[in-house]
A protein has these predicted regions:
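Short Asp/Glu-rich motifs
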Residues: 13, 35, 66-67, 155-156, ...
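Divalent-metal coordination cores built from histidine and acidic residues
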Residues: 21, 28, 32, 38-143
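Histidine/acidic residue-rich metal-binding segments in metalloenzymes
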Residues: 86, 120-146, 152-194
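Short, ordered loop/turn segments at secondary-structure junctions
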Residues: 6, 60-62, 149, 179-181
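Short low-complexity, flexible loop/linker segments enriched in glycine and/or proline
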Residues: 16, 69-73, 160-161, 190-192
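Histidine-centered catalytic micro-motifs
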Residues: 26-37, 175-181
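Histidine-rich, glycine-flanked metal-binding segment
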Residues: 1-26
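A general structural motif
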Residues: 12-13, 97, 170-172
Length: 194
């Protein structure tokens, strides 16, 4: 799409009369879970054929950063990257069709440092998580995301989330959240979020 003008105001090789139509250069999948699918088939035909041109990854969990344990997949094949940036570059290297962007997942940071234990992060773990969040921002993350309705993300305290959000805020990063509750604790979840 080069220009949007009233009919007959522009001479061009191709002119499309979009009167009474919605015009978009492409749709954005803001909650994309296609990372693994893109590793298998980068063409992303299902979304591309629906007009999706940008896949936003990383809701809660992300391609990185990964520690040695996290890199070993269930199929025993090691993931060939460590950082979020390397994971995104891996997808680009496969020649994926859509544009991709990613949040760094707060769950990924927590598992990297705390594992799956239901306990508060120590001060040292929080500082390392903040450093990993900053590194992900420097590698191109658009912000940090949480999925607080799922374990082990729900083990994180509000203070932990605030500390991580402050780290990405240093880079003008965004914060998005799948809140802790969508039911009986909805108001409390909204209070925590806002």
């Amino acid at each position: 799409i080069s220009y949007l003008v009233p009919p007959a105001e522009l001479n061009a090789r191709t002119v499309i009369d979009a009167t009474s139509k919605a015009v978009s250069p492409g749709f954005i999948n803001m909650l994309s879970w296609t990372a693994n699918a893109l590793r298998r088939d980068g063409k992303s035909q299902s979304d591309i054929r629906q007009g999706v041109t940008l896949e936003v990854l990383g809701e809660g969990s992300s391609l990185g950063p990964l520690n040695a344990t996290m890199r070993r997949r269930k199929d025993e094949a090691d993931v060939p990257w460590i950082t979020l940036g390397q994971g995104l570059e891996h997808l680009v290297g496969l020649g994926v069709s859509p544009n991709i962007a990613s949040f760094v997942g707060a769950t990924t940071l927590r598992v990297h440092e705390v594992g799956y234990e239901n306990r508060p992060a120590t001060e040292a773990e929080l500082e390392r998580m903040q450093a990993l969040a900053r590194a992900a921002m420097e590698e191109g993350a658009v912000g940090i995301s949480t999925a607080l309705i799922y374990a082990p993300a729900d083990y994180a305290s509000t203070e932990e989330l605030v500390r991580l959000a402050k780290a990405v805020a240093e880079y003008d990063g965004l914060y998005i959240s799948h809140m802790r509750s969508e039911g009986s604790q909805l108001l409390e979840a909204l209070d925590e979020l806002f």
